[in-house]
Amino acid sequence: MTPRAIFDRARLAQLHGRELASFRAARPRSAALAERARAHMPGGVPMSWMVKWPGEFPVFVEHAEGAHFTCVDGIDHIDLCLGDTGAMMGHSPAPTVESVTAQLSRGITTMLPTEDAIAVSNGLFERFGLPYWQFTLTATDANRHAIRYARHLTGRSKIVVHDYCYHGSVDETFATLDGDGRTTNRRNSIGPPVDTSETTRVVEFNDVEGLEKALSEGDVAAILVEPALTNIGIVLPDEGYNEAVRELATKHGVMLINDETHTICAGPGGITRRDNLHPDFLVIGKSIGGGVPCGTFGFTQEVADRITRSVELEDIDVGGIGGTLAGNGLSMAAMKATLEQVMTQEAFDHMIPLADAWADGVQAGIDAVGAPWHVTRLGARAEYNFSPEPSRNGQEAHDADDFELQQYLHLYALNRGILLTPFHNMALMSPATTRADVDAHTAMFDECLRELFSQP
């Protein structure tokens, strides 16, 4: 059974119209700013994704702190999106703000190292177990650099990714499987430089046999994975799947890149440390700087030795790795404070039980109306999906999507002061999130479903 079979679509449209009217009425200042913004920004936003929020215009933020933000219309919001993980440790955590503020007066960027870089790289080694680290401004760039090194070291060109993966704006990852199981450009991918079938081989998540086949041709440089899919809903690995990926990578001489940018929600060392995984490279960004643009990639001793032997000093600045602002003093100050004082085990001991409570509340609301939906959990992150059973791969998760329904549920929440990520039904807990915040969502969600599934 699908959601379309158990409630009236006409009623959904009617309720959605009501919520749109309420949204407009409550936010005149955001509406006015959106109109002004359209003069010189397409869609009235500084970054195109911001048009995907469920209202007719984005909510403009006046102030964000902890797990709440206030919009320009004076409405307080519980933030369960948290900048889609960028603010997973809360908005403007005090240690990060203090460190960044001090660094601003000492110099923002010099293209020379600061002492903070030593502390950050040491801390990342202790956290993830990889001994060497380099820094970027985004996880996207960290992924790009890891892929380039993998190609350089293996002499191979292709990469393998999971169907419906997400690794930032890395060109090679905007690929999916067509109906015949062949790699093709992802729908609505904007301006791909080449057909992704030339650069990429796509396999389904949790498909060990498919991965073995993809690697068997001997032309794959790297497997780029999230240890659990997070951007098509949460898709958890089967028992032993990540270990099988490692074994197959080793067997076929392929570099394994674990992208923990979202899955860091599993704990201070992400799924990699929690499950004792052993990638050749590990990538992380977003949350490690407390909201300041940061990214990093770590690698093994073997990889470091091979890079040292094969990269020439004379051309190191034109080899496609690095960037003028990467490793700047401000980013390093932000990462040092965030990693040492904010992204701690104690923080996750607070966050993960709250995510469990959120998931329990959502599941209770689903069960109360008999909806064939389920909730999936991953550390401090949880998500509800419009299918009766958890998805085992990206295609199953994609097939369970319902954009109209999602937009309504998100708008209903937003009108009651609760923000979810706009891309799917994900909630993220921060160290500043409280049980009262979770309970407010539980009550709102229950009310929303009872109205949607009742007869008018």
Predicted regions and their residues:
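Conserved N-terminal phosphate-binding loop of PLP-dependent enzymes in the Aspartate aminotransferase
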Residues: M1-P456
